[in-house]
Amino acid sequence: MAVDKEVELHAQAWDHALSYITPTALSAAVELEIPDILEDHGGLMSLSELSAASGCPREPLYRLMRFLIFHGIFTKSNDCYAQSPLSRVFTRENLGPYMLMQATPVTRSPAGLSGEALKTGTPLYLKSIRGEDSWNDPAYGFHMRAFTNGMAAHARLTAAAIVTNYPTAFNGVRSVVDVGGRHGMAIGKLVEAFPWVRGIAFDLPEVVADAPPRKGVDFVGGDMFESLPKADAVMLMWVLHDWSDDKCIEILKKCKEAIPTSTGKVMIVDAIINEEGEGDEFSGARLSLDMTMMAMTTQGKERSYKEWVHLLNEAGFSKHTVKNIKTIEFVIEAYP
């Protein structure tokens, strides 16, 4: 049956206009712990069982699940619900906490990517709604616990991708500084997989002061714009995309000072925007991250390969390599 082109275009337009509903509904399911309830149950669950386990009344839960099943998140058989391979990715041990981080009132504010914000260069996401920095304003609603849990989930998954897809990453490396390492989730997972490495989680003093002990990881407080602990390698995981080119060059120069000239390396774990060729499964997500950075920050961004090369050259690195670790980030290794 032929589809009227005008009807098809209008259908696509409606999908775009209402597209924000899908992640919002998925966040609600994660908040209700639906993926974990189904995973822990280990099989099909009736609506009544799922309602009792989640504490959500039957009627809204039915409508929520109907929507998410349509979009391929969960499955249904004989009027009972079950996990799908996709919904398993949103359990508490996977991307569930990151999904909740993206569902806080500030992160979901459409004002950050408004026409006004783009014209003025001041993202309403953080500052212009109340004239102050919402990262430090709990009353506005940015839940720091959600942020911390979300970033920890991201760090855990990215570290696992490095272990699986780049098993030689730390050959010959005895010590690694994880800049912006917060509570050491990423470096802890890496040290666990590569036990000959001594990990150093480096972050602001007030951040590392609250860090729980981790085997093989030392916590050091400081300022990355002043100096870094000496080590064989320095890792920057999801750090440089927060900063302008000039600030990135400053940070990279400090990293270069912290490693041995002949054998050291800086490991940048960050997205690379594809502007040439076909890209991969994560190309769309990386572009979405760039929109997020434009909404969140005044100068942060995701960068193309050419933009990364420019930063490395300006910071004085002589060569670099790029490793695809089959996730949203790559590992860019820069050598003095």
UniProtKB/Swiss-Prot annotation:
Expressed in leaves. Changing residue 292 to I: Slight acquired ability to produce SALV from scutellarein-7-methyl ether (SCU7Me). Acquired ability to produce salvigenin (SALV), and slightly ladanein (LAD) from scutellarein-7-methyl ether (SCU7Me). InterPro entries: COMT-like, O_MeTrfase_dom, Plant_O-MeTrfase_dimerisation, SAM-dependent_MTases_sf, WH-like_DNA-bd_sf, WH_DNA-bd_sf. Nevadensin is a selective inhibitor of human carboxylesterase 1 (hCE-1), a key enzyme responsible for the hydrolysis of a wide range of endogenous and xenobiotic esters. It holds the Pfam family Dimerisation. Pathway: Flavonoid metabolism. Changing residue 298 to A: Acquired ability to produce salvigenin (SALV), and slightly ladanein (LAD) from scutellarein-7-methyl ether (SCU7Me). The keyword Transferase applies. Keywords: Methyltransferase, S-adenosyl-L-methionine, Transferase. The active site is at 241 (proton acceptor). GO terms for molecular function: O-methyltransferase activity; protein dimerization activity. Changing residue 296 to V: Slight acquired ability to produce SALV from scutellarein-7-methyl ether (SCU7Me). Acquired ability to produce salvigenin (SALV), and slightly ladanein (LAD) from scutellarein-7-methyl ether (SCU7Me). Its EC number is 2.1.1.-. GO terms for biological process: methylation. S-adenosyl-L-methionine binds at residues 140, 203. It catalyses: ladanein + S-adenosyl-L-methionine = salvigenin + S-adenosyl-L-homocysteine + H(+); scutellarein 7-methyl ether + S-adenosyl-L-methionine = cirsimaritin + S-adenosyl-L-homocysteine + H(+). Changing residue 297 to M: Slight acquired ability to produce SALV from scutellarein-7-methyl ether (SCU7Me). Acquired ability to produce salvigenin (SALV), and slightly ladanein (LAD) from scutellarein-7-methyl ether (SCU7Me). Belongs to the class I-like SAM-binding methyltransferase superfamily. Cation-independent O-methyltransferase family. Homodimer. Flavonoid 6-O-methyltransferase involved in the biosynthesis of polymethoxylated flavonoids natural products such as nevadensin and salvigenin (SALV), aroma compounds which contribute to the flavor of sweet basil, and exhibit pharmacological activities such as anti-allergic, anti-oxidant, antibacterial, anti-proliferative, and anti-inflammatory effects. Catalyzes S-adenosylmethionine-dependent regioselective 6-O-methylation of flavonoids; active on various hydroxylated flavonoid substrates, including scutellarein-7-methyl ether (SCU7Me) and ladanein (LAD). This is Flavonoid 6-O-methyltransferase 4. It comes from Ocimum basilicum.
